[in-house]
Swiss-Prot record:
GO terms for molecular function: structural constituent of ribosome. It comes from the Bacteria. This is Small ribosomal subunit protein uS2. PANTHER family: 30S RIBOSOMAL PROTEIN S2 PROKARYOTIC AND ORGANELLAR (PTHR12534), SMALL RIBOSOMAL SUBUNIT PROTEIN US2M (PTHR12534:SF0). InterPro entries: Ribosomal_uS2, Ribosomal_uS2_bac/mit/plastid, Ribosomal_uS2_CS, Ribosomal_uS2_flav_dom_sf. Gene3D superfamilies: Glucose-6-phosphate isomerase like protein, domain 1, Helix hairpin bin. One of its GO terms (cellular component) is cytosolic small ribosomal subunit. Pfam families: Ribosomal_S2 (PF00318).
Length: 275
């Protein structure tokens, strides 16, 4: 599990909450006090919850699950995109499109259109069109890529969502809750931690704090992937063990072992299209 110390959190400003007049009383257990009308978050409470959240992310990745990184506010976009790409997970950094989860079937159609336009631009199709048609198709591609480019390889609903600001991403969280998708999120002093499954009490605005969260989440995912069992190796060991029990001392043919593909995780049921 990625180790983030309390000192690192202090240096990143994780302990600075919002103004006291905007606080949510349900965050009281995680607030140390106030300084200059700003709530101070108790990092002694944050650290264990942070570790629990990272362990959960790691367990998802170890089972070859998918974690959707979500951060559409300006201070989170760059870090979320960079770290999601580093751990090869889907992400969204522009405006959340209503129905991205609950109407996933329609979203996949839009993604298919994006891939179609990308292919047309590289296979010579655009060269056969007149200039104004090409400009129109490129604008369409750019618009689709801005909103869906980060999830174009996400072929099924995610197994979990990692969120930076639950107020900014409230629609996404409602959709995830409706579908039973676990939400791991940074929760500042002005929100209700009960809205998510794994709450991390902390500043959700400071760029350094957001970088710390995103980097740790990506590290947790990479650690989980590294710990995932290699199905080919497991099968070879099982084959050899069975052969040993029969007293024949046979070994699994290397070719068969390497050709054995990992079982894909069961696809989450698609929600019916919204009316």
């Amino acid at each position: 599990m990625p180790q983030v110390t309390m000192r690192q959190m202090l240096e990143a400003g994780v302990h600075f909450g919002h103004q006291t007049r905007y606080w949510n009383p349900k965050m009281a257990p995680y607030i140390f006090g106030a300084r200059g009308k700003i709530h101070i978050i108790n990092l002694e409470k944050t650290v264990p919850l942070f570790n629990d959240a990272m362990n959960f992310l790691s367990s998802i990745a170890q089972k070859r699950g998918t974690v959707l990184f979500l951060g559409t506010k300006r201070s989170a976009r760059e870090s979320i995109k960079e770290e999601a790409e580093r751990c090869n997970m889907p992400f969204m950094t522009q405006r959340w499109l209503g129905g991205t989860l609950t109407n996933f079937r329609t979203v996949k159609q839009s993604v298919a259109r994006l891939k179609e336009l990308e292919a047309a631009e590289t296979d010579g199709t655009f060269e056969k069109l007149v200039k104004h048609e090409v400009l129109g198709l490129r604008r369409e591609r750019e618009k689709l890529d801005a909103s869906l480019g980060g999830i174009k390889e996400m072929n099924r609903l995610p197994d979990a969502i990692f969120v930076i600001d639950i107020g900014h991403e409230d629609i996404a969280i409602k959709e995830a809750k409706k579908l039973g998708i676990p939400v791991i999120a940074v929760v500042d002093t002005n929100y209700d931690p009960a809205l998510v499954d794994y709450a991390i009490p902390g500043n959700d605005d400071a760029i350094r704090a957001v970088q710390l969260y995103a980097r740790a989440a990506a590290d947790a995912v990479l650690e989980g992937k590294a710990a995932a069992p290699n199905s080919a190796s497991v099968r070879e060991e099982e084959f050899s063990a069975e052969a040993g029990d029969e007293g024949k001392g046979r070994r699994a043919p290397a070719k068969k072992a390497t050709e054995k593909k990992a079982d894909a995780p069961a696809a989450a049921p698609e929600a019916p299209a919204a009316e």
